Regions:
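C-terminal region of N-terminal signal peptides and the immediate post-cleavage residues
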Residues: 30-60, 121, 588
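Short beta-strand edge/turn micro-motifs at domain boundaries
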Residues: 120-126, 130-132, 142-192
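Short pre-catalytic segments that frame enzyme active sites
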Residues: 179-196, 211-221, 228, 253-256, ...
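Secretory targeting and sorting signals
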Residues: 12-38
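Short solvent-exposed beta->alpha transition segments
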Residues: 39-46, 60-106, 115-119
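Conserved SxxK-family serine transpeptidase/carboxypeptidase catalytic domain
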Residues: 37, 58-59, 91-105, 260-282, ...
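Beta-lactam-recognizing serine transpeptidase/beta-lactamase-like catalytic domain environment
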Residues: 371-373, 380-381, 414-447, 461-673
Length: 691
């Protein structure tokens, strides 16, 4: 039986309601209604929260929807958001209040969309929209917070809850697509489109443009322009013209969709020009004009700068939504390391796509076709974020010096490198790696024994132990430490054997003179001296770099080998150029390849120490193994030759090194397989300094 004030199915309560605030499980304050007696309707908050979670997930199962089946509502949501790609949404209850009808409640939902994969929570209403309009709690105006954690698109929507005695919760939801967005109606959908931003340039010293958009041709097979059975044959022919793997291209073409364009290669305009006629003669082969971020030449600083191209599946997956299939992104080098900066922010547009129009069932047979088939309504833009171009990346590379270095290494068969640093700033002006490295950045990442170029470091350790440049050291034909015999290089001048000064030992590169001092400078002092010259340090160069390792502990033959830059001592050409730069600058130099400059290290090298080292390096040119540099035009040159044995062959193979300073320039030259520093690296250094 029911009391007089109630009706079956309607569950009407007559008590005057009051609006209160209660905290939900998610911490959101929700307005609820409490009556004055046990006859009041149950709390609607759980249903409101259940609805919010369901709208967020797209699964309406379990939500009391009145006359609408949960599976129908779920299917409707799925259809509405099918065009939103991987975008995700959060939905929270912000208000729940009684309407004019005391048996209904209106729930207000905050909806926040993460359109670009940032995974951010919803923003507060009232923040600035992309158009500068403040969003309010009563309109669905899109908003964008100025913080990185804000969603891309936010708005509010409402839903109506009704008292229902036949449900466990006591309430049902009036289902409508408008719960997902206020402007949605039956059959309407949401569609997200994305515009990739303009990629920024990579700049060199003085702001000179190095990498910018340059004309290219995308060459491939258009399967709509060739019979499917002949497509693999065309692919093979095209591969032979452009120099790619014929079998691989043919297989990709065979497996691609019937309307696919299958890329074979992207060619610079100048490289493609002589091939265009041959490409055109192949059925289905096309060359499409395009642009791509490229350096001045194909090989210009390629191991450093890297390349750009179509995003791989792995990059898309790892980007968290920032990158999508079809984007052109950095694939290696600085292009990949600074891709977010260079790539900018993609533009996003969400449109409401109206339902397809249907013919008027009351139309007569004489009605015009236009009347029978109304023109489709235009999509309406609900949210738009313009693409923001990338920010240029400023590097320290000097185009002229980099080009000169690469030109000198072009015909060097083994792995090789030339690195130039400006001592006054630490700026890396050139970091060229020869073709023998097969694309590896020998200049910055190579790990090799530095040989006698390390004697600059050993000299600093000896100076700190009390020696001077005029101190006598014993240059013997051989030196034996713990049973291991060390000797000088084969054509060491016989006149420089015996008691000589430290200056003469450096000038002529006497191995035994330094090994005979192994008790004067221990391994720890070598490591400290190396750090004072920037070798073995951990500076933020701005690009991947190996700045060397010098063990702090070693004794016996290992320590003796360290005295002449062998054993476990390793350096890259960049590291040895840093040593030379520190000598020239008069203080420890931190090399920098990308602005802003690296934090200068604490001053561990004194000006007085550097002055002595400068004199020792000048002695190499004035009276020693670098005499051939004496006539290089310009400021006086200081240098140090280096030859480092490696491998197990007899006689052992050797790395060829040379470092030099001239004015505000420090240079390191390296050839992985060479005769000696002066004979192999020396001519390259002389040509580089001579311009």
């Amino acid at each position: 039986m029911f009391d007089d004030g109630q009706e079956r199915g309607a569950m009407i309560w007559k008590k005057a309601p009051r609006r209160i605030l209660a905290a939900t499980a998610g911490g959101v304050l929700v307005a609820t209604v409490a009556g004055c007696s046990g006859d009041d309707p149950p709390d609607a908050t759980p249903v409101a929260e259940q609805l919010a979670q369901a709208v967020a997930s797209g699964d309406l199962a379990g939500v009391p929807l009145g006359d609408t089946a949960a599976e129908d509502a779920t299917a409707a949501v799925e259809a509405i958001v099918a065009g939103m790609g991987a975008a995700t949404r959060t939905v929270t209850v912000t208000d729940l209040e009684q309407t004019d009808d005391e048996n209904t409640r209106q729930v207000t939902l905050d909806v926040g969309w993460d359109l670009d994969g940032s995974g951010a929570p919803a923003a507060e209403p009232g923040t600035e929209s992309p158009t500068g309009t403040a969003a309010t709690t009563s309109t669905p105006t899109p908003t964008a917070s100025g913080t990185p954690d804000a969603p891309d698109w936010t708005y509010q929507t409402t839903a109506t809850l009704r008292v229902a005695e036949d449900t466990e919760a006591g309430w049902t939801v009036d289902w409508s697509p408008a719960i997902l967005h206020p402007q949605l109606s039956d059959g309407a959908t949401l569609d997200l489109s994305r515009t990739q931003a303009t990629r920024a340039d990579i700049l060199g010293a003085g702001g000179e443009v190095i990498v910018t958009e340059r004309p290219v041709y995308r060459v491939g097979i258009d399967k709509t322009r060739v019979d499917a059975a002949l497509a693999p044959e065309s692919a093979t022919a095209l591969a032979e013209v452009v120099g790619v793997d014929p079998a691989g291209l043919a297989e990709r073409v065979q497996n691609a969709g019937e309307r696919a364009f299958v890329d074979a290669i992207t060619l610079r305009e100048a490289d493609a020009a002589p091939l265009l006629a041959q490409i055109e003669a192949i059925e289905g082969a096309v060359a499409i004009e395009d642009t791509l971020a490229l350096a001045p030449t194909r090989d210009f600083a390629r191991p450093i700068l890297g390349t750009v191209g179509d995003a791989t599946a792995e990059l898309v997956e790892e980007s968290g939504g920032r990158i999508v299939a079809g984007d052109v992104v950095g694939l290696s080098g600085l292009q990949a390391q600074y891709d977010a900066q260079l790539g900018g922010t993609s533009g996003l547009t969400v449109e409401l796509v109206p339902p397809e129009p249907s013919g008027d069932p009351t139309a007569t047979a004489t009605a015009s076709p236009a009347a029978e088939e109304p023109a489709p309504a235009e999509p309406e833009v609900l949210f738009e974020r313009e693409a923001a171009p990338g920010t240029p990346l400023a590097t320290t590379l000097n185009v002229e010096l980099q080009s000169r270095a690469e030109g000198l290494l072009a015909d060097v068969a083994p792995a090789s490198a030339i690195v130039a640093i400006q001592p006054s700033t630490g700026a890396v002006l050139a970091a060229a790696s020869g073709p023998g490295g097969e694309g590896y950045s020998t200049a910055t990442l190579g790990q090799y024994a530095p040989g006698s170029t390390f004697k600059v470091v050993t000299s600093l350790a000896l100076l700190r132990a009390g020696l001077t440049s005029d101190s006598a050291v014993e240059c013997t034909p051989t030196a034996t430490v713990d049973g291991r015999e060390f000797s000088n290089y084969s054509d060491y001048p016989s006149g420089a054997i015996g008691d000589i000064t430290l200056r003469e030992a450096v000038a002529n590169s006497c191995n035994t003179a330094f090994i005979n001092q192994n008790a004067v400078a221990d391994q720890a002092s070598l490591a400290q001296a190396a750090a004072s010259l920037g070798l073995g340090a951990e500076y933020q160069v701005g690009a991947p770099a190996f700045l060397g390792t010098v063990p702090a502990e070693a004794d016996g033959t290992a320590h003796a080998a360290s005295m002449i830059g062998q054993g476990e001592v390793l350096a890259s050409p960049l590291a040895m150029a840093t040593v030379a730069a520190s000598v020239a600058a008069g203080h420890t130099v931190a090399p920098t390849m990308v602005d802003p400059a690296a934090t200068p290290p604490e001053g561990t090298l004194t000006a007085d120490e550097a002055a002595v080292l400068q004199d020792l390096m000048r002695a190499v040119v004035e009276e020693g193994s670098g005499a051939f540099l004496g006539d290089v035009p310009g400021d006086p040159v200081g240098a140090k030759t280096g030859t480092a044995e490696y491998g197990t062959e007899t006689p052992p193979r050797t790395h060829a090194w040379m470092i030099a300073t001239q004015g505000d320039l420090a240079v390191a030259v390296f050839v992985e397989d060479g005769e000696s520093g002066s004979r192999t690296a020396g001519p390259l250094l002389e040509a580089f300094l001579g311009g």
